[in-house]
Amino acid sequence: LLGLWGCTAAPVKELPDNVKLSEPQSRMGSTVRLVDAVTFERQGAVKQSPATCVSLNVDNSEVTLSDSSASFVGSYTGTYYDIESSRKEGGGATLQHADAESGVVVAKGVTEYTSGGLMPIGHAARYKLLVAPMPGKTVVQFKDIEYAQKSTGYMENTGFQRLGTWWGSGVMDAYAAMEQQADKVLDCIYSESLIGE
């Protein structure tokens, strides 16, 4: 088990330049950093309302987290009792603030991703999203990013925690999911029409 943890706690060495990290800190014998923000931008003049595009493309649904940590083998019968528990976390309104004059939008969202090669592990990342139109470009920034493994099997599911640079967080897969989310919002903002053909 410790050998496996060592693989998951090992830090990811290179992240894209648009990822802002915290100061280094120790985690299970490795030096890692937390992800403070991930920022994307696109050049051009805004064509659609950022608030509308966030409402159409960002979801803040509840996430179901589960485990089977209460499972046991009966002492007299030797029968295995698989006791799965689950709970829902998060949810609520997506839009937190929308300024019609400046176009600035603050929202909460969640996206799901998988990490791990041969044995994919389902994760969810929740975040605060800032969309800020500026002269000649629009910035989309993810902050307060937390992740959780959706099912932890026989280990207790401790829920969401800050996203960091260790392999076990699936940080690069989380990054790809955020990039895809940002692209959806930006594609909408720069589209000629909100009505699909």
Indicate where each model-derived feature is located.
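Extracytoplasmic/secreted envelope proteins and their assembly/folding machinery
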Residues: 47, 51, 55, 128, ...
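C-terminal partner/receptor-binding element of secreted or periplasmic proteins
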Residues: 157-197
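A short, aromatic/hydrophobic, helix- or strand-capping loop or linear motif
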Residues: 58-94, 98
